[in-house]
Amino acid sequence: MNEKITTLDEFIFKRQNDFEYAAGELTALLRDIGVAAKIINREVNRAGLVNILGVQGDTNFTGDTVQKLDIYANDKIIECLKNSGMCCGVASEENDDYIPFPALFSKFGNYVVLMDPLDGSSNIDVNVSVGTIFAIYRRTSPSEGPATLEDFLQKGIKQVAAGYVLYGTSTILVYTTGKGVNGFTLDPSIGEFCLSHRDIMIPARGNYYSVNQGYYLKFDLEMRRYIDYCSDENLGLRYIGSMVADVHRIMFQGGIFLYPSTRRHPQGKLRLLYECNPMSFIVEQAGGKAISCDMNRIMEIEATALHQKSSIAIGSPDMVDEMQAFIQKYSAQRG
């Protein structure tokens, strides 16, 4: 007998009491993000048929070329969050500053959302997987006023929920509220995300490492030695160029994802608030680890700016520990 299908909405509602503030607001907010993901998925699937491929012609705050689909995804998520009334503001990789919502749209707005609306969007023109990453925090500012910058600059350990959506051969939404990690696959026949991966746990080790080896000569000597070690140990190199896709594979098959600092980007290149924190929360909840390449736990890093960057090593716990020990050993030898 087939097991009853559990939709994302049903699952979120059943788990509502897991939330510290079980008033239904976070439940509604997560549902609205699911709605936005369906809308984006539709456009991703039609991207080659409509005028939405290619670059917009602009660069965002951190210098990345903006794709047309970046703008579409960004606008749709903001629209869904604004209409929900459960969110007092949003910060996005695609916007220079955070966007506070007027009181009219945030009557119950006790949360803020930070997001990368379309991670890996440069891949869309060649039909390679892209994704959405989001983090949700409870606001720290008074509820009767507008959102403030401090609401968004909270440490990753303060996240109340985080998730990602991978738009690939099938579309899957993975999220956590600090009570484990679950995945939901979009069933196009009914237009619903359905529970497909319950209580995801990352393997302690894996046979893969993921890094942009084109930057090899720009990495610190210790990191180059570690990458050489991975190759010598016959680990397979897998790198897609979309953090969501690369980390999603590691979630199920094990391994380690690396985005080290370089001479050009001494603090790293990925955004702490939009990419590193939410993905770290998810991976840690699945039993993995996430640290910066200077050996600090990602979710403990103090944010001082919306678009702050960080290096990251994330994935199977034994492999992250091994990398940390390896780097520290060779750093000590260099004095």
PLM regions and their residue ranges:
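Alpha-helical scaffold segments that form or flank carboxylate-/histidine-based iron centers
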Residues: 64-67
